[in-house]
Swiss-Prot record:
Disruption phenotype: Decreased levels of tri- and dimethylated 'Lys-4' of histone H3 in the somatic cells in embryos and young adult animals. Increased dimethylated 'Lys-4' of histone H3 in primordial germ cells. Decreased dimethylated 'Lys-4' of histone H3 in the distal region of the germline. Reduced fertility. RNAi-mediated knockdown results in the extension of lifespan. Decreased levels of trimethylated 'Lys-4' of histone H3 in L3 stage larvae. Leads to a deregulation of fat metabolism and to an accumulation of mono-unsaturated fatty acids in the intestine. Pfam families: ASH2L-like_WH (PF21198), PHD_ash2p_like (PF21257), SPRY (PF00622). It comes from Caenorhabditis elegans. It comes from the Eukaryota. Component of the set-2/ash-2 histone methyltransferase (HMT) complex. Required for the di- and trimethylation at 'Lys-4' of histone H3, a mark associated with epigenetic transcriptional activation. Implicated in the epigenetic inheritance of lifespan over several generations. Functions as a transcriptional regulator. Acts in the germline to limit the longevity of the soma, probably by regulating a lipid metabolism pathway that signals from the germline to the intestine, thereby preventing accumulation of mono-unsaturated fatty acids. GO terms for cellular component: nucleus; Set1C/COMPASS complex. This is Set1/Ash2 histone methyltransferase complex subunit ash-2. Its main location: nucleus. Expressed in somatic and germline tissues (at protein level). CDD domains: PHD_ash2p_like, SPRY_Ash2.
Length: 570
């Protein structure tokens, strides 16, 4: 007969937090190094630890990535096991530390009294600088140069831990106002990185495979095993490439743009002669010069198949979101003139929002329009406008499902020359990617463009007379931004949660403002400008073209004179 004491049939009594603190029977000291025992749930001061007293100087307040057992629960000695903190866990520690400093300065820091309001902190001015200065005190993970680029979207995904200010995207706070509860045993902390319940309840993915017929050989058992559907495995939510139709109609796979890397489908440039040194039958490796290829542009303007966040669902020019804010851009951009596109707000489930506007290709796709210097946006909630994560009042009431929104950008040009005044051609012509790496991916060639957005942000200059204007159901809301940074801007939309919106890129608009051109007309114009940009690149880099010497012809001198004139014009 099973004993009534212990055994499987008896549930363990839930742990309750003790009322005393530390070996010294003192009080909590928020803002200093403290650790909690995973067995008795008692908090201990870093200075009072027996075997690990060095934590008082080497540790940081509000650490959450460790397991500690006190000497009262483990008589032989204290036990300490540190765990590697990821970005979200680091942010919990940093926000708690900075919040404690703010509350202490205001005379409100106490373990007995919980603040009524959230303690908001600036991501740009407080959180990121603190993490940069104390990185290796917070984690053993190697610090990357652009680690903070996607910090805001990362925090937004952990809704049980962080809250964002309604009117300022740069301000974040801890959802837990009682700092005395923060530690490795906090329920929200324990769920960091765990998959949401709705993902856990997804139906297992079954893959239908055709029956394998043939004689019973040694490999038959392996083939039978391959026929069985795979269940229970976690599906990879991220993706590395998108499948789409190329301009020539062929279905291809194209890598997603992400983390300062962008990819452009190419074709052989018919204006560049083949290298006579190349022999397709040679056994040694041959590196194809990238200038032998050119970017293959879409004949029409549409939502880009790869210059978008991977988690967005694209159907034609309709975009549906997933979880936190993420962005999609159009396939063509503008750097001069007055251009216009519209957005139809198709579906707005509860607590979902969108932002629309214009962004440069350097703007992060895992963030919202208006998150940094490279984008300007307008939010459906409250009608707030955003730039550099700073929200300002713009159009009272915002917009909602069923509304038609217009986006206009004006980048002034010289009336006679029809180009921006006092700007070199490389500032308004599309970039020639002939000087970038040429890579092979899924049987196609792509230009791989890698540029540090942080470095480019330092070189931005305002364009006098430029502006962005938004329209609500055909009526102007006024100029939202003036004297914006010069650069190439793309129609952009970012979606929060599962809202759906459609980009209307022309040629039929509900309301085309006077003097503006529909963005659809940019397709033909960019074809010509891209060709000119490539020609200028070839002329300026001619000395690097590695072709063998040829026999001089009578017209060589005339050709040299023409090329010399072109260089002088450049």
């Amino acid at each position: 007969m099973r004993s009534s004491k212990g055994g499987r049939g008896r549930q363990a009594a839930p742990k309750t937090a003790p009322t005393t603190v530390c070996y010294c029977d003192g009080k909590r000291e928020l803002g200093s190094v403290e650790v909690v025992c995973s067995t008795c749930l008692k908090w201990f001061h870093g200075r009072c630890l027996k075997e690990f007293h060095e934590l008082n100087s080497n540790g940081v307040p509000f650490m959450i990535c460790y397991t500690f057992t006190c000497k009262q629960c483990r008589p032989t000695a204290e036990d300490w096991k540190a765990k590697k903190a990821d970005l979200v866990q680091m942010c919990v520690t940093v926000l708690a530390t900075l919040s404690a400093e703010r509350l202490k300065a205001d005379g409100k820091l106490s373990a007995e009294h919980v603040p009524e309001d959230f303690t908001y902190l600036s991501l740009k001015d407080e959180i990121v600088p603190y993490m940069n200065e104390n990185w290796y005190m917070l984690t053993a993970i190697k610090q990357k140069k652009e680690w903070h680029q996607n910090l805001a979207p990362t925090l937004l995904k952990e809704k049980n831990i962080f809250v964002q200010h309604n009117d300022d995207d740069d301000l974040f706070a801890l959802a837990e106002k009682n700092l005395s509860l923060l530690g490795p045993l906090h329920e929200a902390v324990k769920l960091i990185g765990k998959r949401p319940i709705e993902r856990e309840n997804r139906e297992p993915r079954h893959i239908e495979l055709p029956p394998i017929e043939g004689p019973k050989t040694r490999g038959a058992s392996k083939r039978r095993h391959a026929e069985a559907p795979v269940t229970g495995k976690k599906q990879k939510l991220a993706a590395d490439y998108s499948s789409t139709a190329a301009p020539n109609g062929v279905q291809i796979d194209i890598p997603f743009s992400k983390d300062n890397y962008r990819y452009y489908l190419t074709e052989v440039d018919p204006n560049v002669p083949e290298d006579p040194a190349w022999n397709q039958n040679q056994s040694s490796a041959y590196v194809i010069p990238s200038f032998h290829y050119r970017e293959l542009l879409n004949p029409t303007v549409n939502v880009s198949s790869n210059d978008r966040a991977f988690q967005l669902s694209i159907n034609g020019n309709s975009i549906t979101g997933f979880e936190g804010y993420s962005m999609a851009r159009a396939s063509h951009g503008v750097s001069k003139g007055t251009w216009y596109f519209e957005v139809n707000f198709d579906d707005q489930p509860d607590d979902s929002h969108i932002r629309i506007g214009w962004s440069q290709s350097y703007a992060s796709l895992q963030a919202c329009v208006g998150y940094n210097k490279f984008s300007y946006g307008w939010r459906s909630k409250h009608g707030t406008k955003f730039h550099e994560a700073k929200g300002k009042k713009y159009h009272f009431g915002g917009f909602k499902q069923g509304d038609v929104l217009g986006c206009l950008i004006h980048l002034p040009v010289d009336k006679k020359l029809q180009i921006p005044a006092n700007l070199p051609s490389e500032k308004y012509l599309p970039v020639s990617h002939k000087g970038f790496n040429l890579i092979s991916f899924k049987a196609n060639y792509f230009f791989e463009v890698q540029e540090e957005s942080a470095d480019i942000a330092k070189t931005l200059v305002e364009m006098p007379g430029s502006y962005i204007e938004f329209f609500h159901n055909g009526k102007s809301c006024g100029k939202a931004y003036e004297n914006i940074y010069a650069g190439a801007y793309y129609p952009s939309i970012s979606i929060f949660k599962s809202a759906t919106a459609t980009m209307n890129l022309g040629p039929k608009f509900r309301n085309l403002p006077r003097g503006a051109t529909g963005i659809h007309a940019r397709a033909d114009e960019q074809q010509h400008e891209q060709t000119l940009s490539d020609m200028l690149y070839l002329v300026s880099k001619e000395v690097n073209l590695d072709h063998p010497p040829r026999v001089k012809r009578e017209d060589d001198d005339d050709v040299k004179d023409i090329k010399k004139e072109i260089k002088q014009e450049i």
